[in-house]
Every structure is written in structure tokens, then in C-alpha cells.
Amino acid sequence: MSKRLFSSGIFTGLFTLTLSVHTIAFAKVEKLIGLPTSQNTNLAFKLPETEKTEIILSREQYLLSYNKETRTPNYVAWKLESTNIGSSGRSNNFSLDTDLDAYLNESNRHAVDANDYRGSCFDRGHQVPSADRTDTVSNNETTFLMSNMLPQTAYLNRVIWEHLEQYSRDLVQKQGKKLFIIAGPIYDKAMGAIGPERDIQIPSKNFKLIYILNANQTPASIDVKTPGIAVIMPNILQNGSTDLSDKKELCKPVTNEAADRRDWEKYKTTLSEVERLSGLKFVSSKI
């Protein structure tokens, strides 16, 4: 028996924990690159369970599960606390993940290049935000590795997704919180693909889970009273459409100056819905 994160209704922002026997296979890790997962402090719990084969990139800055079939992450997990936010600024150095590329080259594959989104009108959408790693230049640069990106519409990336990112940092900087965050794609509808080979799969939605702790707390202190946020945001155009084949709308300039900064709240959902749509199971005992 082990604790599994589960909730049937977290619109209130609270996660609940129940005991559950594992019913699906453990993560199918093809390759671990980097730190042992037990030493990665960005992971609040054990690796999420998934039926997808994954390559784990375990770094000081985050832990990333990469899917070589979609050529995108299955999820990325990171910790956000006050020491992660500094004055290094945004490097803007989108680049090939050379660690991932070296491994993929062994089977005649390659990692996504910084230019592979060119001409698609999709943003290179950070999962770990640049602004969550501004303590040093090198830490910020790791957020610009293309393995950390998903094809996101400009409206999703620069408006509703960004507003939740800003809210998260406000929790840390203004309320003294520590966050454990997991974000990734949902592929419940065929949305096409981009890239020179048309093999970078476009997600229909993006999910994010945020566990909100006090600065002096550790993952071991997470219980039924621990507040959290779960959202599922559609890969949506500014006009509200999810028809991403509409290149005219997809390529339109987007601004968030007049947008409601709390617009992300309309996308709150339940942990169980995130699990259902993403195919991931979140287990609270750490490896």
C-alpha cells in the first residue's frame, strides 16, 4: 500500500490523499540521464506512473520525462522557492538539449533543434518558466533547452499560461511560499504536428499541478490540508477557437496588456481529471 494523490474535486484548491494499491505499471524508464531521481530535490514524490516509455532528464534545475515518439516532454517537475528567483534575467538562448541528443543519436534519432518551430506560428512554450530560474545565468539557460518546450499558441503561452506563472511567483515572493510544480501536455485529440519532419506533436491542452507549502516545509509535510492548484488549459487561439489549422488566427500578434490576470482560474480542474487526460498517476511516496 502506498499513498496516491487523488481528488474528486479540487476546484477549492485542496489536494486530498488516500491510500491506494498501484494498479498500473511503474514508469517505463528507457534511460536516466543525470542525477539519480532520489537525489533530485525538484521531485516532491516518486516518478509519476505512466504507460508511456520515457527518457528521464534529471537535472539540478528540474526533472523532465521526455517522449521520443511525440518529441515533447511527458511532464516536467520543478521546485520554486525564493532562492531560485534573482537578477540574471532572460537568456533567450533557445538551444538543442545536447545531453538528450547524444543519447538519441545512438538510435539514429535526434533532439528538437531551436529552429524546428520556425514558420509554424507556434510559440516554443516553456514548461519550467525562464523567470523561475533567474538565480544564475547557467540555471536560466537550462530552461531554454528545447526539451523543455511544447508547441503552444501565442495566446496560451503569453496570456493565460503566463498569468498562472506570474501568480506562482507571487506566492513565493510575496507570501513566502515554496512550490512543487508539475506541468505537461495532454494529447486527447489529434492536433497535427510541426517541424521539418512534421513529427513534433501539438498538444490539445496543457496541464499544471502546483503544491503550495510554507518556505520551511518539505514534501514529507504534504497532507490533506496542503493547498494546491490543478489546471487544464486548452491550446487555444485569442478568439477562443481551438481550430489550430486556422493559420490566419494562429499567426496573429497577441497582447496580454488588457487581459484579466486571474483568467487562469477558469481552467481550474481536479487532480483526477489531470490524471485521466494525461495518462499519468501521481504517487506521494518518493523513490
Q: Can you annotate each of these PLM segments?
A:
Residues 5-9, 13-287:
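Domain-level detector for secreted/extracellular nuclease and nuclease-toxin modules, and
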